[in-house]
Swiss-Prot record:
Protein's name according to its UniProt entry: Putative uncharacterized protein ExoD
Superkingdom assignment: Bacteria
Lineage, highest ranks first: Bacteria, Pseudomonadati, Pseudomonadota, Gammaproteobacteria, Enterobacterales
Family under the similarity heading: To bacteriophage lambda exonuclease exo.
InterPro entries assigned to the protein according to its UniProt record, in alphabetical order: PDDEXK-like_dom_sf, Restrct_endonuc-II-like
Remarks, miscellaneous: Encoded by the cryptic lambdoid prophage DLP12.
Amino acid sequence: MKFRLGGFEAIKSAYMAQVQYSMWVTRKDAWYFANYDPRMKREGLHYVVIERNEKYMASFDEMVPEFIEKMDEALAEIGFVFGEQWR
């Protein structure tokens, strides 16, 4: 209900981060954020278009390589190398 009444501003920050990350991965400039509620007979599917936010993109540019490095270190500690599972 909050999303329908508040639109873009009512989207939870965790969902916004997820949408922005999806745009970072796919290099898209916009993303549909949708919510389906079968109780809303007139408009069961409600959506807004979210534009790419360059502050999020800069954060991901910095954080993702750091995460990958830490993950590789953790995997190495238990004797794994990422990608070996597909060889």
